[in-house]
Amino acid sequence: MSRSLLLWFLLFLLLLPPLPVLLADPGAPTPVNPCCYYPCQHQGICVRFGLDRYQCDCTRTGYSGPNCTIPGLWTWLRNSLRPSPSFTHFLLTHGRWFWEFVNATFIREMLMRLVLTVRSNLIPSPPTYNSAHDYISWESFSNVSYYTRILPSVPKDCPTPMGTKGKKQLPDAQLLARRFLLRRKFIPDPQGTNLMFAFFAQHFTHQFFKTSGKMGPGFTKALGHGVDLGHIYGDNLERQYQLRLFKDGKLKYQVLDGEMYPPSVEEAPVLMHYPRGIPPQSQMAVGQEVFGLLPGLMLYATLWLREHNRVCDLLKAEHPTWGDEQLFQTTRLILIGETIKIVIEEYVQQLSGYFLQLKFDPELLFGVQFQYRNRIAMEFNHLYHWHPLMPDSFKVGSQEYSYEQFLFNTSMLVDYGVEALVDAFSRQIAGRIGGGRNMDHHILHVAVDVIRESREMRLQPFNEYRKRFGMKPYTSFQELVGEKEMAAELEELYGDIDALEFYPGLLLEKCHPNSIFGESMIEIGAPFSLKGLLGNPICSPEYWKPSTFGGEVGFNIVKTATLKKLVCLNTKTCPYVSFRVPDASQDDGPAVERPSTEL
């Protein structure tokens, strides 16, 4: 009986009409992607599950807990002993007599090794994300056409452009630039950085910052992703072959007024970006197509051309049996080494303002875990837009040139000569980068483009990058900028300090005392820079040996390279050359001295 009733009951259920599908109430709020809140701390990775759940992957962060906030014992101990970035900067920029002692002892190498490892470890290797993939993927690793990303993009379905904080619409980029970045009055760099430095920065970085106009802002044409001197030799083999002489390893050149200069486009038919109306014989052909824009860029192109051909002569004398290809390739490696040496020991030294004397010695890292590979990050590209360095006008000798007179000036380099331009650029002070309101109106559009590009690529807020690089997030705009008026304006536009964008945050942050920029530019920029420099193959144990550079002669050129040698071994007279303007007591006007003949 009971079995019969059960069968009738089951049959009744089968005959019932299906339950209607209940649609969500149109007025009910859509669940917010929990990763929009950036809940995972200390480099934990947010993974979304379902609609409103997430999980933080805290693997190897040193932290545990739902949001990676509970430190392990060793992590807690390390954090307790680690000085703050501001305190570290204070120590390194004070007490000159103490650092003179340190620089003369083995302690210098110990500290340099510590600096290199701590900074480099902040950069993920292999690379993690790119503009198309906000998660680990094979494409992010293998496709070198992309810039890598340190942090994934802001999720597309967040309530606000920067996640959950701030206003529904970001302030107009043009308005931001005019209010906070446009120069009112030229602010010189308190560290004494000069235009020789500014043009070196532009020339040097254009070998690896080459956003692809055809593919879009997330892509790069500089597939070497590091110091490969593509701006000297070209970023592809076809361009390189057009620039080479194919004799004794040398590059093509022309002689004007008894001096060596890059060849004309007529002699080396490569694409160069010059205004219409400039004939091919007046256009100089070099590795980077935009270097005709500024005489300062073509000045460095000329110096490195002369250096390449000079080193070829030295190697030819050492190795008379070598052919053109081996002379060319070995000279290229030597110039890569010279570049890295100058960048670390003079360029980065000037930027840092440290009394600790930085040292380029790849052997410092031979005993530690280190990957000799690099990938340029989009954040590094944005960070490096240091256009406040540029002055209101350019002074050469007794003449002063406006931007209209200076840009695409194809005759200045030859008319004045290398020595005169080096002397002039070394004596003219550059602008302060940080602190805001110091960008000339002629180049303000570049900052506007960077801000717009960062929005298209959905870069995370400035405070998230501070946390990623071991700094505390700012709690207010006044804490960021150090003054009330600008802070109030930023508050009005953004609504929340946690909604401030990456590039404006870097340029508006208050500077360290007597410094060219603030804490974040140093703490974020230094890891990218040092990892890129020391991650070069020539710094690896397999490459860093005399035979790589043609013997002790070539190896010695690398190990003793300086900016002064780059100039003075390739000019008839030796002008004042430095990345810093001369002290007032030394600045007695243009003067030259006989060049040194040592290697």
UniProtKB/Swiss-Prot annotation:
Reaction(s) this enzyme catalyzes, per UniProt: (5Z,8Z,11Z,14Z)-eicosatetraenoate + AH2 + 2 O2 = prostaglandin H2 + A + H2O; (5Z,8Z,11Z,14Z)-eicosatetraenoate + 2 O2 = prostaglandin G2; prostaglandin G2 + AH2 = prostaglandin H2 + A + H2O; (9Z,12Z)-octadecadienoate + AH2 + O2 = (9R)-hydroxy-(10E,12Z)-octadecadienoate + A + H2O
Q: Where in the cell is it found?
A: Microsome membrane; Endoplasmic reticulum membrane
What positions does the domain EGF-like occupy?
Answer: 31-69
GO molecular function ontology, one term from the record: oxidoreductase activity, acting on single donors with incorporation of molecular oxygen, incorporation of two atoms of oxygen
Residues modified by glycosylation = N67, N103, N143
The EC number(s) given in the record are 1.14.99.1
The family line of this record is:
Belongs to the prostaglandin G/H synthase family.
Q: For binding heme b, which residues are annotated in this chain's numbering? A: H387
Signal peptide coordinates = 1-23
List the lineage, top down: Eukaryota, Metazoa, Chordata, Craniata, Vertebrata
Principal location? membrane
Disulfide linkages recorded for this protein, renumbered to the chain, are C35-C46, C36-C158, C40-C56, C58-C68, C568-C574
Q: Pfam families given for it?
A: An_peroxidase
Instruction: Give the protein name, as stated in the record.
Output: Prostaglandin G/H synthase 1
TM stretches of this protein? none
Organism encoding this protein: Homo sapiens (Human)
Co-factor note (free text) = Binds 1 heme b (iron(II)-protoporphyrin IX) group per subunit.
